[in-house]
Amino acid sequence: LQSSSAASDVYKRQLFLGFGAGGIGFASSLAFFCASIYSTVILKRQLRDIPTTKEQVDKPSLRKKFFSVGTYILIRSLFLTLFMAYLRNRASLMSMEEIALQHILLQLWSVGYIFVDAIAIASQTLISELVSKKEKYQKSVLQKELVSVTTAISFFLAIITVLFLDNFVEMFGDDKFDLYIDLQLKLLVALSLFIGCYAFLWDGVLLGLDRAKEFSFLTVASSVSGFLVCTYLLRTQNTISTLWIGLNVSLLFRSLLGYKYQK
C-alpha cells in the first residue's frame, strides 16, 4: 500500500512536470522497485527465524519442479493477459464513449475481485499446509470455510454492482455514459464478479493442491472460449455488452473446470 501511494504521488508529479504517459511508466517502475526491495527485506527477516536443517535436498528435482510450475504459470498469465487485452482493444473499434466506459468497467471489475483474490492466495498456503500434514482438502473444514466466505463476497459484489454501477462510473465520467449503462450491462458486470470470485478461488485451490498443469490449462481453455464467443457475437452485436458476455463465458468455463479438477 505504501509503495502504491508513493507511486501515485510520483505519477501526479510526473504529469504535472509534463511527462505524460512517461510518468505512468516511471511511477509503475518505481512502485515495483519499492515493492521488491520491501519484500526482499521482509523475506530475509523471516528466513532468520527459520531453524536450519540437515535434511538432504534433491536440487535437480527441485529445480525441475520450479521451472515446471513457473512455465505453467507463465503460459496461463500469457493467455489471460492476451484475452483481457482483447476485451480492451476490441472496444477501441466502438465510439469514444464506449472505449472510455469499457476501460472504467474493467478497472472497477479489477478492484472488485481483489477481495477474493486475497482469499485465493491465502487458500493456496493453507491448502499446501493441510496436504503436507497428509490430510484431505475435499470435505474438510477449510474447504467449507473458503466456499462460504467466497459465496458471501460474490453475492455482496454482485448486488452492489447492480444497484450502484452507474454511480461508480459517474465518479470517473460524470453522467455522459448514461446512454450505455442499461440493466443488461449491469447484470452482465455483476454476473462476471459473481462467477469470477469462484474462478479465482479455484486458481488458488489448484495451486495449493499442486495441480499447476490443470491450473494453466483451464485458463488457456477459458480464454480461448471467451475469445471465440466474442468474435462470433461481435459480428452482429458490436456492443460493450457483447464483450461482457464473452468474459462471462470465459469465467464460467474456468470456474466449472476449476471445480472439476479439484476432485
Can you say where each PLM-predicted feature lies in the sequence?
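Alpha-helical transmembrane segments of multi-pass membrane proteins
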Residues: 1, 108-110, 176-202, 228
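Single conserved hydrophobic/aromatic residue that forms the stacking wall/gate
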Residues: 1-11
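Helix-terminus/linker motif at the lipid-water interface of multi-pass membrane proteins
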Residues: 15-19, 78-111, 129-130, 169-175
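Interfacial/gating helices of multi-pass transporter permease domains
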Residues: 21-22, 26, 61-69, 91-110, ...
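Small-residue-rich transmembrane alpha-helices that serve as helix-helix interface/gating elements
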Residues: 24-36, 221-224, 240-258
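Interhelical loop/hinge segments that connect adjacent transmembrane helices in multipass membrane
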Residues: 25-28, 39-81, 263
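Small-residue-rich hydrophobic transmembrane alpha-helices
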Residues: 102-163, 197-210, 214-215
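Short membrane-interface helical motifs at transmembrane helix boundaries
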Residues: 156-178
